[in-house]
Amino acid sequence: MQLLPLLAAVAAQATTSQAVQAAPVPIIDMHFHAMGADALGPPGSKICAPYGPWPRRDPAKAIDEYVKRFTIAPDCARPLTGPPTDKALLRANVENIRRYNLIAVASGPSHHVEALYRTAPSQVIPALSFGDGPLPSIIELRQLHAKGLLKVLGELTFQYAGIAPDDPRIEPYYALAEELDLPVAIHIGPGPPGISYFGGPGYRMRHSDPLALEEMLMRHPKLRIYVMHAGWPMGDAMIALMYAHPQVYVDTGVIDYAFPRAEFHAYLKRLVDAGFGDRIMFGSDQMVWPDAVAAALEGIESAEFLTAAQKRDILYNNAARFLRLGKDGKAETQ
């Protein structure tokens, strides 16, 4: 009679072991968004994965014609479509987190971030995106941090407001991040092409120079910071900054799926060949198109110049080190 419980226990253990073996290895997505389905226009907008060639604009025609070809009805082999409702987008985000065993640094409006965090608390690192709209007060940020709802400061989107990364208006946020040991995620580089004409009139590409961070880094030597989009297309400046400031990391958000694959791989290889493969972190920049996660992962996995170990570093190890995560995926110091 005692044999039956023993067999049941062995069977349960075997099933658990098989489940663990079948589970995908964890991936850290340093550039994930939690937002409403209409955050980037009417629900159901599209993005190409990848574009190629980029849509061109005839300035004699209304900007709506360009926007249609860019994100409403783009002509590409693989258009990704956004879900119709906030609930559908949240559900798809949670499904992706579970399917790919993601630890997602999720930024966006605080209520959307909190909704995602409450749904998958063990796999979501809550962050706050701001910079091109009303700015949160330092008191508000301290309160979010005290509640455990602010563990990364960013995505800082000041570039969309025409504000350079070394602008004095950002200084209080850098100082707070250093004080609280909050990693900073800053947007430097590409927005949607042509965004200055239809969605972000303040955006200027000239504010994409990573070296603009240099004096700030000297004022805040203990600050953890990563440059989103790997500073594309400013490869020389990005390499120079990482060389001179060994604490600076980058993520691969959006350039790993929306950009022509040859361009992304050439840019990624440039950073790796320059000796910075251990400071490159995977980021999907999933906004309102959940399938962007799969497309972004393909961008890394298809890079034949990377070894399996280098891919694993980009997909997990580098970010785990930067975030100071323990073996269980939880923060060691926060």
Predicted feature residues:
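Sec-dependent signal peptide recognition
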Residues: 1-9
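Mid-to-C-terminal alpha-helical segments outside catalytic/metal-binding sites
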Residues: 25-75, 91-95, 276-281, 287-334
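Conserved, mostly hydrophobic/aromatic
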Residues: 31, 97, 153, 177, ...
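Active-site environment of divalent metal-dependent phosphoester hydrolases
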Residues: 35-37, 111-114, 133-136, 159-161, ...
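Divalent metal-dependent hydrolysis catalytic cores, especially in the metallo-beta-lactamase
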Residues: 45, 49-86, 92-109, 124-129, ...
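Aromatic-lined substrate-binding rim segments of carbohydrate-active enzymes
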Residues: 87-101, 105-119, 162-186
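Short, acidic/polar
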Residues: 88-93, 133-144
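Catalytic pocket-lining loop regions of alpha/beta-barrel enzymes
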Residues: 118, 122-124, 151-152, 166-281, ...
